[in-house]
A protein has these predicted regions:
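N-terminal twin-arginine translocation
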Residues: 9-15, 25-45
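N-terminal secretory signal peptides
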Residues: 1-11
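Phosphate-handling active-site elements
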Residues: 90-99, 127-145
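Conserved phosphate/anionic-ligand binding catalytic regions in large, soluble enzymes, centered on
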Residues: 113-125
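Active-site-proximal helix-loop elements at catalytic-domain edges
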Residues: 59-93
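Amphipathic alpha-helical interface segments
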Residues: 80-87, 127, 141-219
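Acidic-glycine-rich active-site phosphate/pyrophosphate-binding loop
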Residues: 51-56, 86-105, 188-189
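A short glycine/serine-rich beta->alpha loop
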Residues: 64-73, 106-115, 198-204
Length: 219
């Protein structure tokens, strides 16, 4: 296909010469070198998976998860960002290439549909990135870790008291989730706690503690 000067991204000899003339008119070759030096750096590409994992402080991960639930848009961001932020601090690249708000859409079971709990989804993203492999045994190991996390969640009495020192509502009623699904987990607890409003402070505290507990458990 023939390229034309009007095409986006096409640079002709005439365009280069015209640009050079402008640089020269503006102060000589030195000005051109300065302009080139100020050009944005080429983004560093991320390596293929799996990425490096290090042992993280589970308490710090959990406390960030609790806090990020309230500050960063719900359960999906809470678990994902609690782990990611620690990996950015302790490992650096390539984790620093990951966007902080990647999992905000997972709140309330993905767009409010009450499907998979966002805390599980956010944590699973990180798990996949450190355990992914193309060989069958690696694939099975990856799946097994996520599977165990989901089963643990379903059998857990939520919320725990682990983060009660951060909460204005300690010692909340505990109810077994029975499912990794947001709707089931939240509905069973809400019925037992007498909560009818999804924006009730008690429900917010419960889910913040759940997000913290997921982050704590993954580490």
């Amino acid at each position: 296909m023939e390229a034309h000067e009007s095409d986006v991204g096409f640079v002709s000899r005439r365009t280069i010469l015209a640009g050079s003339a402008v640089l020269l008119a503006g102060g000589g070759v030195g000005s051109g070198i300065t302009a080139l030096a100020a050009a944005p750096e080429t983004p560093v590409s991320a390596p293929p998976l799996p990425w490096q994992w290090v042992k993280l402080d589970p308490v710090e991960a959990g406390r960030r998860g609790y806090r990020f639930y309230k500050e960063k848009g719900g359960c999906g961001s809470a678990s994902y960002l609690s782990l990611l932020s620690l990996l950015k601090e302790q490992v650096g690249h390539p984790w620093t290439t990951m966007p902080d708000m990647l999992m905000v859409h997972a709140a309330a079971g993905f767009g409010g549909h009450g499907t998979l709990c966002g805390a599980l989804a956010g944590a699973s993203v990180i798990i996949n990135m450190v355990t992914y492999g193309e060989k069958r045994d690696e694939y099975l190991q990856n799946n097994a870790i996520v599977d165990r996390l989901f089963w643990w969640y379903a059998e857990q009495d939520f919320p725990t008291e682990r983060f009660d020192d951060l909460s204005p509502l300690p010692k909340q009623i505990k109810v077994k989730a029975m499912s990794p699904l947001c709707h089931t987990s939240v509905s069973k607890w809400s019925l037992a706690a007498g909560v009818t409003d999804l924006h009730d402070q008690a429900k917010i505290e419960r889910c913040a503690k759940v997000a913290g507990e997921v982050a704590y458990t993954v580490t």
